[in-house]
């Protein structure tokens, strides 16, 4: 697919189905792009679609099937939008660090593909409200799904959930308790963690 050069072309990209319940258009909205009038359009739509499909099929679909509707806070971010956000302190890391992350259509420095979406789980915030309860969902995902990395934020316990060809299996948080919950090499990265999410539903697909 060519890079969209018109509204009609962008419509066609938006109609691309990434999985059973998700289309590319679901991931195109960006507050930065919207407010500052920067088109959020991929330079390499085919690569963005490929990575987005893996994200949706392997992570978002089973999460939605298990926990109900997901609220998508953000998804795809083109390099131009991300660079603007980085230079203007709008909570965007550098393009190099965001490739194969929110920038779905750029490979990372090692040539791997990846894609990230920021997700809120209404089921989680409706059922849990104690400090640190986000860890229940994080451990459930860790035990059940092939995620690459998770970053947790304080507001609504929104989570950046990444699919990547070379998963780091790392969970970090800006919500309390802050820091690294697990990563490859830590003793808690392996094994079963079901004691942390007692009462959670079984995985559905």
Indicate where each model-derived feature is located:
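N-terminal, Lys/Arg- and Ser/Thr-rich interaction peptides
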Residues: 1-45
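Cell-envelope/glycan interface and biosynthesis
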Residues: 29-142
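Intrinsic disorder/low-structure terminal segments
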Residues: 21-22, 26-28, 34, 66, ...
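A general marker of short, structured functional hotspots
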Residues: 23, 32, 72, 193-196
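Alpha-helical protein-protein interaction elements
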Residues: 15-21, 27-28, 59, 68, ...
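Catalytic cores and adjacent binding grooves of peptidoglycan-active enzymes
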Residues: 103-205
């Amino acid at each position: 697919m060519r890079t969209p050069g018109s509204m009609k072309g962008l419509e066609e990209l938006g109609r691309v189905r990434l999985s059973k319940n998700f289309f590319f258009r679901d991931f195109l909205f960006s507050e930065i792009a919207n407010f500052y009038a920067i088109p959020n359009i991929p330079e390499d739509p085919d690569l963005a679609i490929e990575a987005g499909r893996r994200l949706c099929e392997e992570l978002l679909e089973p999460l939605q099937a298990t926990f109900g509707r997901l609220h998508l806070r953000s998804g795809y971010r083109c390099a131009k939008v991300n660079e603007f956000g980085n230079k203007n302190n709008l909570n965007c890391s550098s393009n190099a660090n965001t490739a194969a992350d929110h920038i779905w259509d750029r490979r990372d420095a090692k040539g791997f593909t990846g894609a990230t979406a920021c997700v809120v789980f209404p089921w989680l915030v409706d059922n849990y409200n104690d400090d640190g309860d986000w860890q229940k969902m994080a451990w459930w995902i860790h035990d059940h799904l092939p995620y690459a990395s998770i970053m947790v934020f304080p507001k609504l316990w929104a989570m950046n959930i990444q699919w990547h060809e070379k998963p780091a299996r790392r969970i970090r948080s800006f919500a309390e308790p802050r820091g690294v919950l697990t990563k490859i090499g830590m003793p808690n990265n392996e094994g079963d963690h079901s004691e942390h999410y007692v009462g959670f539903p079984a995985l559905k697909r």
